[in-house]
Amino acid sequence: MKNITNYYVEDKSKLISNKDAYIVGKKFRITVLSHRLVRIEYSEKGLFEDRPTSLIINRSFPKIDYFITESDSMIEINTGVFTLTYVKDSPIKSGILSSNIKAVINGTKKEWQINNPEVRNLRGINYSIDSVKDKIVLDKGLYSLDGFCLLDDSRSLVLDENDMFIERDKDIKDLYLFMYDNDFEGCLSDYFTLTGYPSMIPRYALGAWWYKNNNYKEEEIKEVKENKEVKNEI
């Protein structure tokens, strides 16, 4: 019987990014995954995560060129699509008036900061409105009219060496920043590269005919089966 790791992670080697994608400090690690996507980690202990999480199973993206400008206290990363600026080894947390980390989409005024409320986010979806009487509050989605979205993976469970999902250190930050401007297709492609595509059930499992929730009687089901030449195993 296969363990969870072998079932969940197709290729363990893809959990590690290209070595040229890393910019590492004492308490931070920034990984440039694509021209539109960067991973930002912060840990007081200087410990960074390479194991799969309940959301992320692939951090191996094609190598890209990017440019770094840095001083003793600051680092600036330009991917060609956006520019990220960070005060080295400073805590990454929301709720502060002047952010120590920010990113700007090149050639625009679209700026992200850690405390950005992302009010122009187009939100996600709701699966059902059954028995709903109050206003539905949708979760944040990938797409935003601002052209950026922050995915916080800090609280996701980690799949450890014992094949168990465990909680992470509460003092760490593990963020994925999508800076795509109007390239929505590229954003979605990066997301599915990161998380894997959703599994699809076989087409035959969806059934052999469509109906409007009619209450079929046994004889009617037999008639449909004969008319549609439905196989017994289906």
Please state what every model-predicted region is:
Residues K2-N3, Y8-V9, L33-D72:
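A low-complexity, Ser/Thr/Gly/Pro-enriched, surface-exposed linker/loop concept
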Residues E10, K14-R29, L33-R39:
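N-terminal-proximal low-complexity accessory segments that begin disordered
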Residues K14-S17, Y22-V24, S60-P62, T69-S71, ...:
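Residues that act as N-cap/strand-start positions at coil-to-secondary-structure junctions
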